[in-house]
Amino acid sequence: MSSCFKSSVSLFSVFLFMILKTVTSDPTYLYHICPNTTTYSRNSSYLTNLRTVLSSLSSPNAAYASLFDNAAAGEENDSNRVYGVFLCRGDVSAEICRDCVAFAANETLQRCPREKVAVIWYDECMVRYSNQSIVGQMRIRPGVFLTNKQNITENQVSRFNESLPALLIDVAVKAALSSRKFATEKANFTVFQTIYSLVQCTPDLTNQDCESCLRQVINYLPRCCDRSVGGRVIAPSCSFRYELYPFYNETIAAAPMAPPPSSTVTAPPLNIPSEKGKGKNLTVIVTAIAVPVSVCVLLLGAMCWLLARRRNNKLSAETEDLDEDGITSTETLQFQFSAIEAATNKFSESNKLGHGGFGEVYKGQLITGETVAIKRLSQGSTQGAEEFKNEVDVVAKLQHRNLAKLLGYCLDGEEKILVYEFVPNKSLDYFLFDNEKRRVLDWQRRYKIIEGIARGILYLHRDSRLTIIHRDLKASNILLDADMHPKISDFGMARIFGVDQTQANTKRIVGTYGYMSPEYAIHGKYSVKSDVYSFGVLVLELITGKKNSSFYEEDGLGDLVTYVWKLWVENSPLELVDEAMRGNFQTNEVIRCIHIALLCVQEDSSERPSMDDILVMMNSFTVTLPIPKRSGFLLRTMKDSRDPRSGGSASDHSATSKSLPLSVDDSSITIVYPR
């Protein structure tokens, strides 16, 4: 009997160890993002400071009990200073928090070995660091969508879509008002089903910022989790999750794991009489087997429940609509047409903002209260359909303060709709080419607009990992936010280059004459230097306050570039300056910007500077600028092809070197810096 009992206990111990090992294994990895916009080198001060920060966050002295802590290392105002935070899920213990943070601190250096900015998410915690201060700063980007594979049945969709947003908004308000910035809530969905929700912000946010952050991520609900029985959106500053099962640590979640009453596992009496004494032995044997087996069954049930939870998390991670670069794919951005109609009051005239590329633009309000700009493409336009798909594919991959943010899209029959962030100050041309409104644009603002556009283009060309050529940069495609910061928009013409690709050819010329580079307008060749040419024209328009097309056949001048060149060689560049800011600008900055613009519009694209070089020229007056060469491309030579006074698009026009007898060097495409 003793041997049997010991054997049973031994087996039970092994089984229990296996269960505990499963339960206490590594944290559940969700996702990580480390954009390569800024990197550090090996043995650099930044790496030393980063290791100090991660060591501090994962040290025994960190504030695991409060589930949130921050650290910094490096001198104040030093570019190598590092800031870091961790946030653990509000329902985990301090021990689980500690283990997760320690694991994440080690893992993030392996997943992001050179990037200065990174965030890594686990089911139990998040670790984030940056070269800029992040404490108290609300950020929803970069973010990740995670969805459950299973869908709600068709007859329940309408009710589910009503219940879920209301539940999440309620729990978001509850979390924002709590000191921990964490809350859970549940709501009855059907007689037999309950929706469980969890939301959380980093505790360093104000109540207002926390609620704003949660409302914004909840806004992604129709795009990330349409009809899904479970899903979540995780961002640097906040997150939400919902499921149709209790996934967080509350009494209702712990109940299935609780052991049954002790009487069910208590050994039966050992003194039952037996005629031959065998009954007693049999009872002992049964007891020796029954006790560990009963406990094992209970623990097996607990293990299955835990594994099911982990499996649900894993399924979510495996089915997320993200590409290998951590960029949200277009599959996660879709709106229902009914939601668009509701947001725009069925596309009422009072909501119309104006006309965009291939359609009209409306102001809309989503169910969470966020104001958006909704671009509705003209129905039946095959060209619009192509540009629509391209715009979604391109813009969904971009994240930069100087690019308009695509929030979603709708494709429903003939309806093709894009949903952008709402930018209150319309576009640059609305101010720049109006005699009264242009006075709002003093030189300081214009200079910041020039710099912002340059940074946005640099991101497209170099830092987005994709090398994107916009091909239609012009004043009407530069939006201005509430602080008059520029945001490049309208990516319907944009093209993505491969890693080693430096140029491309096309017979379908798209864009706007006057902003096109000669090699593109004549030969159909485009590269990053095509956008540099357009940028140069934009800079000249910002300085002069005049449209490029307004110079057509005026005093024998073909275009704005020719007019500027004439005054430049006459050593009278300040005559170009817009009268609206005369006497209120920095002379050296204006002259330098004119000089840079003339370098951008040179005929030979290989002699044009890169956007990287342009920003160096703008920010360092010690850099000597090369002497610009005259552009050989005049708008008046294209009169037979299309009257540039219309400012129209060339999207339906095909051009080759034979159709326009202008002299342009076929080999004038430069080689882009490899990345």
Curated annotation (Swiss-Prot):
GO terms for cellular component: membrane. Coiled coil: none annotated. It is found in: Membrane. Residues 28-134, 140-247 form the Gnk2-homologous domain. Residues 638-661 are annotated as: Disordered. The chain crosses the membrane at residues 282-302. The modification Phosphothreonine is found at residue 512. This is Cysteine-rich receptor-like protein kinase 25. It comes from Arabidopsis thaliana (Mouse-ear cress).
